């Protein structure tokens, strides 16, 4: 069991007794965005995006650092200019790790070494959703973007939802589903970016992104509405 705290620490706990097995600590900048990224476990390793713009790979059994690489290094005169938090969900396909930051950076690094493979100047505080061919994200202005995961080149762009505070898009039967601040759930075609449908499922923003289980989508609105539904064109 792995737990991450707001003070830059990551704990590995024994699954049978809950006792601490290892501890990793990182330096937290004086000013950071609220929230932390969720550690991503894959192939015996734990990948974590940190508040200082680093990505670290840990051995999940003992917490030993396999590599640590600074991938988001904003420069500026003020602490706000230098914000480099990696707070969103990451993705892994084969030997590539995909990371996005509110500092307008999305990038790919090699899982074996931490080597930077490419960088794109569009980022998201909520992170990325990854398919075999593309990366999808809703940036800080709620512009939805498709990015080629092999080289970082930009695909389609949707600007219809600007300033609607979109959640991270999630896959649903070949489409993308995401929510907004007004309680709406939106569906778009993942390949073309065509807007397919929308439906109001609450009166406020949602807690996190939609959760997909099989052919059912679950959303939980801050007005207390929990919804399970299916979608078909």
Q: Model-flagged regions — what are they?
A:
Residues 19-43, 68-92, 116-131, 155-173, ...:
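Extracytoplasmic beta-rich repeat domains
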Residues 1-25, 36:
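A generic tandem-repeat structural signature
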Residues 201-233:
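Blade-level signature of beta-propeller repeat domains, shared across WD40, Kelch, NHL, RCC1
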Residues 14-18, 60-63, 110-113, 148-151, ...:
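Short loop/turn segments that connect beta-strands within beta-propeller blades
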Residues 5-6, 50-51, 94, 101-102, ...:
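Structural signature of WD-repeat beta-propellers
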Residues 11, 56, 107-108, 145, ...:
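WD40 beta-propeller blade core
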Residues 134-146, 153-187:
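Loop/turn-rich, solvent-exposed surfaces of beta-rich toroidal or solenoidal domains
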């Amino acid at each position: 069991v792995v737990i991450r705290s707001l003070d830059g620490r990551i704990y590995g706990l024994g699954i049978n007794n809950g006792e601490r097995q290892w501890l990793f600590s990182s330096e937290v900048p004086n000013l950071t965005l609220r929230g932390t990224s969720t550690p991503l476990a894959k192939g015996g390793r734990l990948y974590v995006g940190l508040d200082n713009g680093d990505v670290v790979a840990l051995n999940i059994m003992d917490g030993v650092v396999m590599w640590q690489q600074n991938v988001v290094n904003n420069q500026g005169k003020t602490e706000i200019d230098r914000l480099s938090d990696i707070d969103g969900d990451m993705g892994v396909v084969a030997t590539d790790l995909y990371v996005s930051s509110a500092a307008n950076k999305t990038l790919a690094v090699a899982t074996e070494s931490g080597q930077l493979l490419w960088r794109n100047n569009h980022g998201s505080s909520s992170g990325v959703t990854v398919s075999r061919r593309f990366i999808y994200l809703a940036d800080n202005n709620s512009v939805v973007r498709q990015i080629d995961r092999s080289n970082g080149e930009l695909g389609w762009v949707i600007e219809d939802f600007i300033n609607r505070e979109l959640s991270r898009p999630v896959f649903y039967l070949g489409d993308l589903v995401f929510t907004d601040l007004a309680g709406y759930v939106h569906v778009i075609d993942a390949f073309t970016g065509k807007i397919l449908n929308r439906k109001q499922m609450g009166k406020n923003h949602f807690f996190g992104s939609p959760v997909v289980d099989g052919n059912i989508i679950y959303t939980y609105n801050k007005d207390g509405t929990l919804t399970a539904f299916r979608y078909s064109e």
